[in-house]
């Protein structure tokens, strides 16, 4: 009895992998945000440049933040990773800060036909049996074989907390294999890597939380995203449009500040602050 090729697979939970979909037309293209409030830029310096009468500019990349987008999936993964890391760090047990562990839970062949929710519920029970008290779960629908070809092999990656025991007893009772495989150099790196080839469903969250870290038991006040502001006058940055002569020659680099004649730019009608 073999495993069906991916194209022929009819398993309910055989979801496509991160980055395997199609991008939108603007994904990965760049746009400009900046500050034209040059009246407040008088007699100011930025990195050794006299900004008097100059517009402050930044280039940003357009992203759809979709997990299946082959261009923008890293932006989605980074956002998910940052939020998950905040939640993991917020957990303390009786005043003690614990070190996260990294587990896998592999689904037995007999349950391959279950829905994702059905497999998750059984995986949760196995984690409870081996004394994993809570954490985050990422679903992987496939593994690679020796020929570097993806095949259906549902399993879960867990980053959480606990003292893992009774693994053999759990396997004998449930058929689900729990392994403690250790974190990478950082928890953040582990989360990002696992998200990079997760099984993506449009109906289900890629990351779910359980046990002591579930939404019902752990309430976290997440950091609010900082507003994009001009480092010179502290005004909000606006989406800008080039109106100068010829083509805009600003290079497509993020994280770099530029300056220019403000006459070459205008605020985009119905402007949107870059988010």
What are the roles of these predicted feature ranges?
Residues 1-152, 161-275:
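Right-hand nucleic-acid polymerase module
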């Amino acid at each position: 009895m073999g495993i069906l090729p991916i194209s022929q697979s009819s398993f309910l939970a055989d979801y496509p992998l991160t980055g395997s979909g199609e991008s939108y037309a603007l994904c990965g293209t760049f746009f400009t945000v900046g500050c034209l409030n040059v009246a407040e830029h008088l007699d100011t310096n930025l990195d050794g440049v006299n900004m008097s009468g100059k517009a402050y500019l930044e280039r940003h990349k357009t992203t759809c933040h979709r997990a299946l987008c082959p261009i923008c999936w890293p932006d989605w993964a980074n956002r998910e990773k940052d939020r998950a890391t905040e939640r993991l760090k917020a957990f303390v047990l009786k005043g003690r800060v614990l070190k996260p562990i990294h587990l896998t839970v592999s689904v037995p062949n007999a349950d391959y036909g279950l829905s994702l929710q059905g497999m998750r519920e059984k995986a949760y029970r196995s984690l409870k049996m081996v004394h994993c008290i809570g954490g985050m779960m990422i679903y992987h629908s496939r593994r690679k074989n020796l020929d570097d070809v993806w095949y259906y092999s549902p399993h879960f990656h867990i980053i959480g907390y606990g003292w893992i025991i009774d693994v053999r007893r759990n396997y004998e009772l449930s058929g689900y294999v729990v392994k403690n495989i250790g974190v990478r150099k950082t928890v953040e790196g582990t989360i990002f890597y696992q998200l990079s080839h997760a099984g993506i469903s449009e109906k289900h969250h890629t990351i779910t939380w359980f046990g002591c870290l579930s939404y019902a038991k752990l309430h976290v006040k997440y950091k609010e995203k900082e507003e994009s502001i001009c480092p010179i006058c502290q005004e909000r940055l606006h989406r800008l449009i080039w109106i100068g002569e010829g083509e805009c020659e600003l290079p497509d680099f993020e994280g770099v500040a530029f300056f220019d004649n403000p006459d070459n730019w205008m605020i985009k009608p119905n402007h949107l602050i870059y988010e």
